[in-house]
């Protein structure tokens, strides 16, 4: 069984399309990794499938409800357990999270299961973060419209470290980020 990555998002089609393409897509087809994207709206309890509301204390923007995210995470945990896997390591992608580095990628690659939760709008109700997060990560000091791109950055950087994903295992060990000096790399043709 390869590493499993789940992404909890309002835009699962967007994320799955990227994960199914290129190197990660080939690795998934060969069974080296497994990726799943989950629609938060599928877990709402209202007819409108609304996932957000105004912040309790006022202020601008909308905040994602805790309930549908919590229910989605419970469903992911049950699905992972049904496969006989250990509980997933749950990471929330937030602007206030710890700055993501290659060291994080290498550490996260040690888990069998990783669940990435994408924020959107003004953020996520803090209660669900407090209840489920093993950690919070930010990919940089800038704001995106949602956590989908951040989750894909994390997923790609972690999954490429897993055996069988890259054609040559040495590929990830000899990348230019490991050296302070970067040389020009022309093609052979």
Task: Tell me what each language-model feature is.
Residues 65-120:
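S-adenosyl-L-methionine/SAH cofactor-binding core of RNA-modifying enzymes
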Residues 124, 128-177:
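Structured adenosyl-cofactor binding patch, chiefly the S-adenosyl-L-methionine
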């Amino acid at each position: 069984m390869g590493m499993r990555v789940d992404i909890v998002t309002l835009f699962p089609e967007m994320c799955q399309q990227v994960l199914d393409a290129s190197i990660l897509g080939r690795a998934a087809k060969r069974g080296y990794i497994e990726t799943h994207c989950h629609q938060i709206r599928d877990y709402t309890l209202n007819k409108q499938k609304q996932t957000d509301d105004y912040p309790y204390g006022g202020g601008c923007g909308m905040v994602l409800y805790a309930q549908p995210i919590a229910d989605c995470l419970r469903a992911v945990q049950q699905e992972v357990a049904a496969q006989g896997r250990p509980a997933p390591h749950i990471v929330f992608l937030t602007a206030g999270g710890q700055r993501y580095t290659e060291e994080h990628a290498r550490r996260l690659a040690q888990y069998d299961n990783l669940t990435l939760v994408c924020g959107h709008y003004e953020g996520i109700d803090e209660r669900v973060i407090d209840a489920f997060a093993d950690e919070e990560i930010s990919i940089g000091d800038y704001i995106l419209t949602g956590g989908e791109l951040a989750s894909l950055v994390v997923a790609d950087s972690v999954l490429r470290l897993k055996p069988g994903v890259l054609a040559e295992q040495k590929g990830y060990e000899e990348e230019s980020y490991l050296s302070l000096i970067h040389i020009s790399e022309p093609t052979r043709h």
